[in-house]
Structure formats: structure tokens, C-alpha cells
Regions:
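A SIS-like phosphosugar-recognition module
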Residues: 1-187
Length: 187
């Protein structure tokens, strides 16, 4: 669940549209993070990374030494990780449009020697430092989460309204959905 931790760390910390003075930033801040281990990630979203319309930088994290004794399994995973990085970089020319891979897709390959508490801690510290430095360079406070707070405030109000059925003052979309939820017995 390392990817889930990184998602929250990056997007909750730096997913801001204004700097610390309240000025709207003229550039994108937090990247969107998602990930899966091994071939799950390859089959889930690498098609889009290789041939999609958006060029998205990505990181591949691999561990050189296997933590298990399955013969050939770890070597296959490492070969696939390296192949993905190579394919993203070089692509493959083809006259057949659906078989053309443009390449020149940015990626970073982080290789740990072994998965140990020290190497995992260093990897987490790297990500935490990256988040902090990015926030400082962008002039945002990486340590407030007002977007999360807004959702909590609205949820408190809506939980009471689900129980009471009161839709007064709500927008039409939320009021309609609240009524529908009450009709289907979710209150």
C-alpha cells in the first residue's frame, strides 16, 4: 500500500490552487499519483502511459534482491520493469497506427538494492522531502488541508439531513440525490 501512502502525502499536501498569500497559482501543483505493484500496474494503466494522448511522467520503483525464493519470478518482474522504462523512452515505430509507440515518455527508475527497513525509510523520506521542497518552491503550505476540511463540514450537515429529510437551502442536485437516498432506505 505504499502507492496509497504516497497518493495521500502528495495530493493532500500539495493539491492546492493558491499560494500562502491567497494568490491563484498560474501553474499546476500536485501531480496525480496512483500505482500498483508488478504486473497489476502494467495491465491497469501502462497502455495509457505508452500510447495515451497525455504525456505523464512516472516513477518505477524496483528492488534488486528478491524477498522470496520463487525461482525466476523476481527476474521476470525486474525484466518487465526495465522493459517498461525502455519502451517509454524509445517507443517503437510502426506504419500501423495502433502499433506505434511514440516513446520520449519521461520516467524515473528507482532501484533499491534490497527491501529493508532502512531502504524503505529512505524511499519514504525521499518522497516526503520532495513534497516539502515542492510546496516551498510553489509558495504553498503543504501542511494544511482545507479541501479535506470542507468535505467534512458538508458531510456533517448532510448526515443530519439524511436522517431528517430536510432539503431546504440545498442545491437541486444534492437535494435530489438526498431524496433518492432516503427513498432507497440508506438512512
Amino acid at each position: 500500500r505504499l502507492a496509497a501512502h504516497w497518493q495521500q502525502l502528495e495530493m493532500e499536501s500539495n493539491g492546492k490552487r493558491v499560494d500562502q498569500t491567497g494568490r491563484t497559482l498560474p501553474f499546476a501543483t500536485s501531480p496525480v499519483l496512483w500505482g500498483e505493484p508488478g504486473s497489476n500496474g502494467q495491465h491497469a494503466f501502462f497502455q495509457m502511459l505508452h500510447q495515451g494522448t497525455d504525456v505523464l511522467p512516472l516513477e518505477i520503483v524496483a528492488v534488486r534482491q528478491s524477498a522470496h525464493g520463487l525461482p525466476g519470478h523476481h527476474e521476470m518482474l525486474l525484466a518487465n520493469a526495465l522493459a517498461q522504462a525502455q519502451a517509454l523512452m524509445l517507443g517503437r515505430a510502426s506504419d500501423c497506427g495502433h502499433r506505434h509507440f511514440p516513446g520520449n515518455r519521461p520516467s524515473t527508475f528507482l532501484l533499491l538494492d534490497a527491501l529493508t527497513p532502512t531502504s524503505l525509510g529512505a524511499l519514504i523520506a525521499l518522497q516526503e522531502h520532495r513534497v516539502f521542497v515542492s510546496g516551498a518552491l510553489w509558495g504553498i503550505n503543504s501542511f494544511d488541508q482545507w479541501g479535506v476540511e470542507l468535505g467534512k463540514v458538508l458531510a456533517n450537515d448532510l448526515q443530519q439531513r439524511l436522517a431528517s429529510g430536510n432539503v431546504e437551502g440545498l442545491d437541486a442536485s444534492t437535494a435530489g440525490m438526498l431524496c433518492r437516498l432516503r427513498q432507497n432506505g440508506s438512512h
